[in-house]
Amino acid sequence: MGEARRDSSSSLQHKKPPWLKLDIPAVVPPAAEEPSFLQPLRRQAFLRSVSMPAEPARVPSPHQEPRRPVLQRQMSITQTIRRGTADWFGVSKDSDSTQKWQRKSIRHCSQRYGKLKPQVIRELDLPSQDNVSLTSTETPPPLYVGPCQLGMQKIVDPLARGRAFRLADDAADGPSAPHTPVTPGAASLCSFSSSRSGFNRLPRRRKRESVAKMSFRAAAALVKGRSVRDGTLRRAQRRSFTPASFLEEDTADFPDELDTSFFAREGVLHEELSTYPDEVFESPSEAALKDWERAPEQVDLTGGALDRSELERSHLMLPLERGWRKQKEGGAAAPQPKVRLRQEVVSTAGQRRGQRIAMPVRKLFAREKRPYGLGMVGRLTNRTYRKRIDSYVKRQIEDMDDHRPFFTYWLTFVHSLVTILAVCIYGVAPVGFSQHETVDSVLRNRGVYENVKYVQQENFWIGPSSEALIHLGAKFSPCMRQDPQVHSFIHAAREREKHSACCVRNDRSGCVQTSEEECSSTLAVWVKWPLHPSAPDLAGQKRRYGSVCHQDPRVCDEPSSEDPHEWPDDITKWPICTKSSAGNHTNHPHMDCVITGRPCCIGTKGRCEITSREYCDFMRGYFHEEATLCSQVHCMDDVCGLLPFLNPEVPDQFYRLWLSLFLHAGVLHCLVSVCFQMTVLRDLEKLAGWHRIAIIYLLSGVTGNLASAIFLPYRAEVGPAGSQFGILACLFVELFQSWQILARPWRAFFKLLAVVLFLFTFGLLPWIDNFAHISGFISGLFLSFAFLPYISFGKFDLYRKRCQIIVFQLVFLGLLAGLVVLFYFYPVRCEWCEFLTCIPFTDKFCEKYELDAQLH
């Protein structure tokens, strides 16, 4: 076969005419595949502009089969936990949540801590410092267009920086409208990476109004005499165009269209704003072009590169997109005017009627965000960013999204509800700053009326008394541990009761358990065992302690005194007799009399008296009808309330450390807390989220209450004082972390310090605990450094953050452990500590916190 083919070809060569010449072209290798980022540019829609004709449609290339996706190993549980923990602490390397947090932190900083540095305002495109742009932070690689595309040459635009460098009047007058292009605009790849572009994110709708805001608007409408529906309709009619949050959906629907750059002369901006058509932007007028052509110094700029140094010298670092100047086909290039260029990035999807005001609408209806370091306090103190901020920092700022302040709303609801219930159930104590005294004539245990006085500390917060607050769950050391002084006080009272006996009056008017000194030898008989003949036997011997009014081991059936469960000789260890076998006549004087006094727990220190019910009610005590001795009742259990102790002799209500955070001393106290929560706490929670703020709030409050319980053990303390100062510490930490981007950080620091010192001075009044303030502030500092992610200024700062999390967590745990050891194992008695929390301007201004200062 091969020989036959060679013979046929040689025969054809001989038959070829001499004038015939065959030129067979060589095989051209296939062209290299275009870069992936240039694939969309093959479509005609991206190469269109107003003054450039459309390219003829090309034959589509055959469809290629998609590649199979690369299989990836699923993360293990350990890796998932590790990555989630890193994201939560804000130290992840490739975490989108970290970037969102950091961008949001900058917004909060701009609102709370004053002005930013001027270069930051210019680079972030923040005329009002409430909208952070990242377009200027991303400079995509140069755009290369092959010579086969309409005669275009390679374009390298080194000044394509985005929107950040804008004219000064733009920052003053707000966002400028798109200008008419002098030269045809080109497709922009920067719009794909721009944070303002809709191609890079899913459409986001505006969140609904909060319930509190709608309720407040409804209440305002009712006060003004209008209906809520009318007000809603009037507000709805004011909007004649679609909000920006819904316009973003149009952008997301056309991912194959790029942004177009438009350039305009500065002088004709305001004249042509009203003449823009709805669908397209036209070129400048012919008269304007003729004026530019008359200038002799103008040169042909077609195809020339933009002079970056000249723009920088004239402070016109413009947000240039990838573009070029195209030379006219088939002739000499027409001279193009050398003008000042301005640019507004306009999405092609916005080329519809009504879209020319999309940017002002977007800023008008966008939900207000909290810049990092510039929150509510920053607006009050006029804080601003510094002029220059690194692009990495700006990227972190813009990625931050606000959180819903669920914890603030829940906490405010609980505080309000508990305060209302406490005031309704326990009433209101006398209002004032001193002590209130009540004197009345009351029948006591001796059978005669006596003038008695009841002393009560006034409450200027308009709320319950200190005894009622302790019963509700206030911070009170004797209810949380076995206080040494309270325990010794109760033990001494029981020793006195051990040597007491029943005092029976001679006129048979009654009997009461008293000591020998309190029983009259002429009007009564003190039935003391074993001197009295009614003494019973115990193990063959007379009992030495007793007698007890209306209680005798010989006549009690439940519990009975039988061997081997005989009642001991010590009467303070006798149980309560619930059933007696004998009637009214036992031939024992201490059993046949009418008892006129029973145990009554008075005050907050565990003091017990055997007295009448009338006196006990007057002293606001707890009367025990079933008992006959004070040793048979546990007054601290009555005073503390809540859950009973596991061991009646050992108080164990440690949960008061966090339970008291939800109580308030009165209505005014609750209003102050609500105002703080709806301003400072709500603002911080929108930045950090409910979980971080809840941890800092609760742990700071617990630490503050623990320190207060150590240094002021006998004072009933309620309210989130430590928690509030812990939240204030978050503001200091936020200020320290945003120190590099603030224009005047020292000014913001001294303003915050003045606020804290004022609140600390306010804590010198009664019912306000400065020990909780100090400890809560210190613990809040440690917790904020550990749990609040912040802006990182480089890789070293990221590693430092990880070490900082571990160190401050260990420091806080050490502080908490030290306070626990001091509270439970090494109690501290500090006599001068009360002057740090309340200055006694008068003798009755501050409540006396000593153990036996108030025996009522």
Swiss-Prot record:
Gene3D superfamilies hit by this protein: Rhomboid-like
Region annotated Disordered, chain positions: 1-21
Major localization class: endoplasmic reticulum
Key words of the record: Endoplasmic reticulum, Glycoprotein, Golgi apparatus, Growth factor binding, Membrane, Phosphoprotein, Protein transport, Transmembrane, Transmembrane helix, Transport
Segments on the Lumenal face: 434-656, 714-715, 769-773, 826-856
Subcellular location, record wording: Endoplasmic reticulum membrane; Golgi apparatus membrane
Membrane topology: Multi-pass membrane protein
SUPFAM superfamilies linked: Rhomboid-like
GO annotation, cellular component aspect: endoplasmic reticulum membrane; Golgi membrane
Annotated protein name in UniProt: Inactive rhomboid protein 1
Organism: Bos taurus
